Amino acid sequence: MPAPLPIQPLPRALDHTLSLPGSKSITNRALILAALADGETHLEGALFSRDTRIMLAALEQLGFETISDEATARITVKGQGGRIPRNNARIDVGNAGTAARFLTAFLALNDGGVYHLDGDAAMRLRPMAGLLESLVSLDAADFKFHGDPAHFPFTLNAKGYKGGKTTVDAKASSQILSALLLASPCTTKGSRQAGGPIKLICPEV
C-alpha cells in the first residue's frame, strides 16, 4: 500500500475554475447514443483516449459523419435515426472493451448487415459469450468465429435486433448489459431484463 499523502490546508479561500477530464466509458456510451439519434448530437467534455478514438474510427468506417476537436473536447456526430449507413465493414476494436461490446449489439440492429470484427491479442482473450449468446437468443444475429468460439475475430451477420425477453449474466462484464440497453431504444419490441432491477452506482466525487 502506498504511503499516505499529507495534504496541507490552504491558507486562504481560492476562486478558480477547474476543467475535469472526461470519462472514457461515458464518452463511448454517448457516441453510440449519438449515432442512434436522428440528426446532429454535440458532445462536450469528451475524453479523447485510445478507446474513444477506436470508437470514432469504427463509426466513421460504418459511414457516420463525425467532427472532433480535441482542443475543446468536443465531438459532433450526425446520427441516422437507428440506421447504419454501411451494410459491410471491417472493424478493429483494438483492446477497447466498450467499443467491442457496444458495437456488437449496435451492429445487430442492421438487418442484412455483414461485419467482420477483430481486436488485438489481448482482446481475443476477453469474454464475449454472454453478449453473443443473448443476441443469438433474441434472433438478432448469427456469428461465424475465425478462432476460438465466442471470441474475436468473428463475422457478425445481423438479423435485426428487434428486442424481446432475454436473460443476461453480467458478472463477466457489466458492458454486456450496457451494450443491449444502449441499442434497445431502436428495437421494435423493446427489451426486458430477467431478474431484479438494474442498479446504477454513481461513485462519490
Regions flagged by a language model, labelled:
Residues 1-205:
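Structural preference for solvent-exposed beta-strand-turn elements
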